[in-house]
């Protein structure tokens, strides 16, 4: 069983001053799709510095739409959206497992935030959806509605902010908001 960390707080997105490093918009994106299910525009997307920021606005919009559809239809395994040009710091990681999306914003030693529904009856049980394949997540901190997950992800991708559509468990020391 999990519980909310004593250092964590439940907040709305507008109550979180999101540390983003030097940039205010997503610079780097990597996506891992289910084998054989990579959307057309994503097939040749480079894994290089500032790969997302370098896209023409029309291409970014088309790729975001394909990403949204892939998330909704369960064709994405994981995502990494970073404010850092090389994808190393200040990032939103998303892992999909068993019909659940585990999202975690991490600004090393400054902030860690995950969507949170602490009032859910089984909130602090294991979601069996791990971040990075190794960090267990409580049910309170996963999204089970893939349409909502897609909206939260695209909001971050397009606005460089956490979505106001959900509450967030946040720890301003950079530790996980649950223990």
Regions found by a protein language model. Give the residues of each.
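The feature represents the first ordered module of a protein
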Residues: 74-106
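Acidic, proline/glycine-rich low-complexity IDRs
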Residues: 1-73, 100, 104-179
């Amino acid at each position: 069983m999990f519980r909310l960390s004593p250092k964590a707080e439940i907040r709305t997105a507008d109550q979180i001053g999101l540390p983003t490093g030097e940039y205010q918009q997503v610079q780097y994106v990597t996506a891992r799709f289910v084998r054989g299910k990579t959307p057309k525009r994503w097939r040749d997307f480079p894994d290089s510095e500032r790969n997302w920021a370098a896209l023409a606005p029309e291409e970014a919009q088309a790729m975001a739409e394909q990403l949204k559809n892939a998330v909704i239809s369960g064709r994405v395994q994981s995502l990494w959206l970073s404010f850092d040009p090389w994808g190393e710091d200040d990032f939103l990681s998303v892992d999909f497992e068993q019909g659940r999306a585990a999202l975690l914003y991490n600004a090393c030693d400054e902030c860690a935030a995950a969507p949170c529904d602490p009032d859910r009856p089984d909130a602090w049980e294991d979601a069996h959806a791990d971040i990075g394949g190794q960090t267990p997540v409580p049910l309170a901190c996963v999204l089970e509605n893939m349409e909502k997950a897609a909206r939260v992800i695209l909001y971050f991708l397009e606005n460089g902010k956490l979505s106001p559509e959900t509450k967030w468990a946040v720890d301003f020391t950079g530790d996980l908001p649950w223990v």
